[in-house]
Swiss-Prot record:
Domain of life: Bacteria
GO CC annotation: cytosol
Biological process terms in GO annotation: mRNA catabolic process; RNA processing
Name listed for the protein in its UniProt record: Polyribonucleotide nucleotidyltransferase
MF (Gene Ontology): 3'-5'-RNA exonuclease activity; magnesium ion binding; polyribonucleotide nucleotidyltransferase activity; RNA binding
Cellular compartment(s): Cytoplasm
Entries under PROSITE patterns matching the protein: KH_TYPE_1, S1
Residues the entry annotates as binding Mg(2+): 489, 495
Family: Belongs to the polyribonucleotide nucleotidyltransferase family.
Domain S1 motif: 630-701
Main function: Involved in mRNA degradation. Catalyzes the phosphorolysis of single-stranded polyribonucleotides processively in the 3'- to 5'-direction.
Length: 750
C-alpha cells in the first residue's frame, strides 16, 4: 500500500524552494520529515522515551551526519564506512542543539534523540542551513512537550543584497555569513563571520533572516495541522513546594546578596556560597532532607540566582565588584616559549590562554573531506580546555563538541585577517590554562598576538569580548554586562561573543535564553561590545604593535617559486631521486603543487637555513634555465678541448654549452689553450640552435670588434674544389647503353 504523504513548500523568493514532507519514511519514529531543496534531501527523525530519568538536565542528543553515498562517493580510510563525525558535522549538531534545548521543559528528563541525515547532496545547496528546520518540523509532528516551532537560516550579502541560504559560490563573494535560529517572535541564536561589518549591518542581517524564518515556521504549522497534531504527552514532573521555596529563599537570599556584593574572587565566592548552602541544609532535620533534600538544593540555587541578578539590576554591581561596562584587568606577553614559531599569553581576570603558532607547507593543510564539501584549510585553530583550568579533575577523553565549537569561532574571527599571499600553512593552538568566563575570546586575543609574534603579516589585529544580559520582563529593567564571568554566563539571559578589528566585526556567536529580546537591547549590547573590544585591542597593541618583520630564527622560512609544468618531472627526477637528494643535501622541505589555472608548478621551499634555501633556488633555476636568443651571458670554462671549450652559465650552474674553437676570435685559433684556460670567466652571445648541429650555439667573437682589414672567408664550392666524384658512375650516367651483350646466359643446373 502506498503511504499517504503530506507536503508543504516554502518559496525562498528567488526561484528556489524548500519542501517539507512526511508520511513516507521512518514512520516508527515519533516524528519524521524529509526536507528537500533542489537535489539535496535531509531525513530527520525524533524519538523521546516515555520514562523519565532521575537527572537534573535533559539528556538530549542531536546527531547530524552526511552520508557519502549522498554524493556518490566512498568514505576515505581503510574500512570504507562512516565513522566518527567530522568537525563540520559536530558544528551543525551544536547549531541545532543550542536552539532546541531551551524549548524543552526544565523538568523534562526523558532520553531524547534528534537524528538528521543527508541522504542526497546537491552542489548548489549547503545542507546544514536546513538542519534546524528539519529538526523542528519533525518535533511538531511528535507529542513532545516543546514550547514552540523554530527554524534556522543562513544569511549572506552579495553586492549589498541579502540572500537566504546562499550557495557556496555566493558565499565566496559575500561579506556576511551568519546562521540565525529563531522562533516566530524571538531570535535565539546567531553565529557567523563577517568582513569587518558595522553593528548596524549585523542587526539588519539578523532582521532579514528572522523574516525568512517566520515563513518557514508557518509552513511547519500547516504541515502539522494537515498531518494531525498529537496531544502533548504527560510526564511525571515534580510539583513545586511553595512553602519550602519561601523558607529557603528567606534563609539564603540576604546572605547570598551580601557575598555577591563583596566583590570577592571566584574561589572565595564559591566557598562562601557553599557555606550558605550548608547552613540552609543544616536547618532541616535528617528526615526532612531525606524526603526533599534535592528540592532544598534546587530552591537554594533559585535564591542564589535571584540575589545575584537583583544586585546587578538594582545597584549596577556585579559578582566581582565591577560595573556593568567594565572589563577585567588584562596582562599580556609574547615570545614566551623559546622554541615555537610564535607564542603569547593573554590573561583577563581569572581567564588565561596560552597560544602557539606553527608554520608549515601546503602539505600541512587541514584536509576537509565531507560529502557536501571537499577542500583544505591553510589556516586553522585548535582550542583545548583541560580540566585543571577550572580546578577540576575529570576523565580526559577526546576532543569535546564544545572544544570544536569554541575553536571554530576563534578561527573564523581571525582567518579573514590572514593575507592571501601568506605562503605558509598556519596552525594556532590555544591552551586554556585558567577559565572564569570567555575563554574563547581569550583565545582570539592570544591568537592575534601569537600570529604577530610569529611574523605572520596580519592585515589588522583582532580582539574579542563576551557580553551578557540580565533582564526583568515584568519591570522592563535590563543590564548589559561586558566581559562576563562564568557565573554570569550561567545566571544571565544571554551569552553574546563579538570579535573584530578597530574597523568592524569579524565574527559573533549569540545564545539568548529569554523570549522577546528587543532589537533595541541587541543594538545597545553591540555598542557596548564595541567599546570593550577597542579597550582590549589597545592592550594587545601595547604588547605587540605590529607583526614582526620576519619569522623567528628557528622558524622555517618559506620561499615560493613557479615553474612551467614541463620542468616538474626534471625537478622530481626518476623515482623522486633528484628532489629527495636535494632535500637531504640542503636540509629543506620541498613541496610541489600544480596550478590548474596557469598550468604552472608551484614550488614551496621550507627551511631554517637561508643557505639551504638558496641552493634549492639555484637548482630550480638551473633546471628551468632557458637562454634567450641574442642575449649575452656570463660563463665559466669548466673543460678545455681540442675543438673548443665547455662552458657553464654562471646564472644557471649545471647548464653547459660548447664554445667552438671557431667562435673564440675573429683570427684563426690554432690552440684553444692560447685563448682560454680552465676557470676563466667570460661573456658569450647566445644564437639559439645551430641549424647544422642542432645544438646550442654561443660565440665569444661576436662580442669583439672585427680586426681592421678582416675579410670573411668565402664559403668553398665543394664541387669546384673536388671535381666530379662519380666519374660518370652517377645514377644519371651509369653507362647502361655500353653494357656488354656478349655475356653468356646463366645455365640452369636443374
Amino acid at each position: 500500500m502506498i503511504p499517504k504523504t503530506f507536503k508543504e513548500v516554502i518559496d525562498l523568493g528567488d526561484g528556489r524552494e524548500i519542501s517539507i514532507e512526511t508520511g513516507k519514511l521512518a514512520k516508527q519514529a515519533h516524528g519524521s520529515v524529509v526536507v528537500q531543496s533542489g537535489k539535496c534531501m535531509l531525513l530527520c527523525t525524533v524519538v523521546s522515551n516515555y520514562e523519565q530519568k532521575d537527572l537534573p538536565f535533559l539528556p538530549l542528543t542531536v546527531d547530524y551526519r552526511e552520508k557519502f553515498a549522498a554524493a556518490g562517493r566512498y568514505p576515505g580510510g581503510f574500512f570504507k564506512r562512516e565513522a566518527r563525525p567530522s568537525d563540520g558535522e559536530v558544528l551543525t549538531m551544536r547549531l541545532v542543539d543550542r536552539v532546541l534545548r531551551p524549548l524543552f521543559p526544565k523538568d523534562y528528563s526523558a532520553e531524547t534523540q534528534v537524528m538528521i541525515q543527508l541522504m542526497s547532496h546537491d552542489d548548489e545547496v549547503m545542507p546544514e542551513a536546513m538542519a534546524g528546520l528539519a529538526a523542528s518540523a519533525a518535533i511538531q509532528l511528535s507529542d513532545f512537550p516543546f514550547e514552540c516551532a523554530i527554524s534556522e537560516a543562513r544569511v549572506g550579502r552579495v553586492n549589498g543584497e541579502f540572500i537566504i541560504n546562499p550557495t557556496r559560490a555566493q558565499l565566496a563573494e559575500s561579506d556576511i555569513e551568519m546562521m540565525i535560529g529563531a522562533s516566530a517572535d524571538s531570535v535565539m541564536m546567531v553565529e557567523g563571520e563577517m568582513d569587518e561589518i558595522s553593528e548596524e549591518d549585523m542587526v539588519e542581517a539578523i532582521k532579514f533572516a528572522h523574516e525568512a524564518i517566520k515563513v518557514q515556521i508557518e509552513a511547519q504549522h500547516r504541515l502539522a495541522d494537515a498531518f494531525g497534531r498529537k496531544e502533548v504527552r504527560e510526564y511525571e514532573d515534580a510539583p513545586e513546594n511553595e512553602d519550602l521555596v519561601k523558607k529557603v529563599h528567606d534563609m539564603a537570599y540576604d546572605k547570598v546578596y551580601a557575598v555577591a556584593k563583596a566583590g570577592s574572587s571566584k574561589k572565595e565566592r564559591t566557598d562562601a556560597f557553599a557555606s550558605i548552602k550548608e547552613e540552609v541544609k543544616a536547618s532541616f532535620s535528617e528526615e526532612e532532607l531525606e524526603e526533599y533534600g534535592d528540592l532544598v538544593s534546587d530552591y537554594y540555587r533559585k535564591a542564589e540566582k535571584a540575589a545575584v541578578r537583583d544586585l546587578t539590576l538594582n545597584e549596577g554591581i556585579r559578582l566581582d565588584g565591577r560595573k556593568t561596562d567594565e572589563v577585567r584587568d588584562i596582562w599580556c606577553e609574547v615570545d614566551y616559549l623559546p622554541s615555537v614559531h610564535g607564542s603569547s599569553i593573554f590573561t583577563r581576570g581569572e581567564t588565561q590562554a596560552l597560544a602557539t603558532v606553527t608554520l608549515g607547507t601546503s602539505r600541512d593543510a587541514n584536509q576537509i573531506d565531507m560529502p557536501s564539501h571537499e577542500g583544505e584549510e591553510r589556516f586553522y585553530l585548535h582550542y583545548n580546555f583541560p580540566p585543571f583550568c577550572t580546578g577540576e579533575a575529570r576523565p580526559i577523553r577526546g576532543t569535546s563538541r564544545r572544544e570544536v565549537g569554541h575553536g571554530n569561532l576563534a578561527q573564523r574571527a581571525l582567518k579573514g585577517m590572514i593575507p592571501e599571499e601568506c605562503p605558509y600553512t598556519v596552525r594556532v593552538v590555544s591552551e586554556v590554562l585558567e577559565s572564569n568566563g570567555s575563554s574563547s575570546m581569550a583565545t582570539v586575543c592570544a591568537g592575534t598576538m601569537a600570529l604577530m609574534d610569529a611574523g605572520v603579516q596580519m592585515k589588522k589585529p583582532v580582539s574579542g569580548i563576551a557580553m551578557g544580559l540580565i533582564s526583568d520582563g515584568d519591570s522592563g529593567k535590563y543590564a548589559v554586562l561586558s566581559d562576563i564571568l562564568g557565573d554570569e554566563d550561567h545566571l544571565g539571559d544571554m551569552d553574546f561573543k563579538v570579535t573584530g578589528t578597530a574597523d568592524g566585526i569579524t565574527a559573533c556567536q549569540m545564545d539568548i535564553k529569554v523570549k522577546g529580546l528587543s532589537y533595541e537591547i541587541l543594538v545597545n549590547a553591540l555598542k557596548q561590545a564595541r567599546d570593550g573590544r577597542l579597550h582590549i585591542l589597545e592592550k594587545l597593541t601595547d604588547t605587540i604593535a605590529q607583526p614582526n618583520a620576519d619569522v623567528k630564527a628557528y622558524a622555517p622560512k618559506m620561499i615560493t617559486r613557479r615553474i612551467p609544468n614541463e620542468f616538474i618531472g626534471a625537478l622530481i627526477g626518476p623515482g623522486g631521486k633528484v628532489i629527495q637528494e636535494l632535500q637531504k643535501e640542503t636540509g629543506t622541505t620541498i613541496v610541489i603543487n600544480e596550478d590548474p589555472v596557469t598550468e604552472e608548478g608551484i614550488i614551496e621551499i621550507l627551511g631554517t637555513e637561508q643557505e639551504g634555501i638558496d641552493k634549492v633556488i639555484a637548482k630550480i633555476e638551473s633546471i628551468t634555465f632557458k637562454p634567450e636568443k641574442g642575449s649575452v651571458y656570463e660563463v665559466k670554462v669548466i673543460k678545455v678541448l681540442d675543438f673548443g671549450a665547455v662552458v657553464e652559465y654562471m646564472d644557471a650552474p649545471g647548464n653547459e654549452v660548447l664554445l667552438h674553437i671557431s667562435e673564440l676570435a675573429w683570427e684563426r685559433t690554432n690552440d684553444v689553450n692560447d685563448v682560454l684556460k680552465l676557470g676563466d670567466v667570460l661573456d658569450v652571445k647566445y644564437f639559439g640552435l645551430d641549424p647544422k648541429t642542432r645544438k646550442d650555439k654561443v660565440s665569444r667573437k661576436a662580442l669583439m670588434e672585427k680586426p681592421e682589414g678582416y675579410k670573411e672567408r668565402a664559403p668553398r664550392d665543394r664541387d669546384d674544389k673536388r671535381g666530379s666524384r662519380d666519374n660518370n658512375r652517377g645514377r644519371d650516367n651509369r653507362g647502361r647503353d655500353n653494357r656488354r651483350d656478349d655475356r653468356k646466359p646463366r645455365e640452369n643446373k636443374d
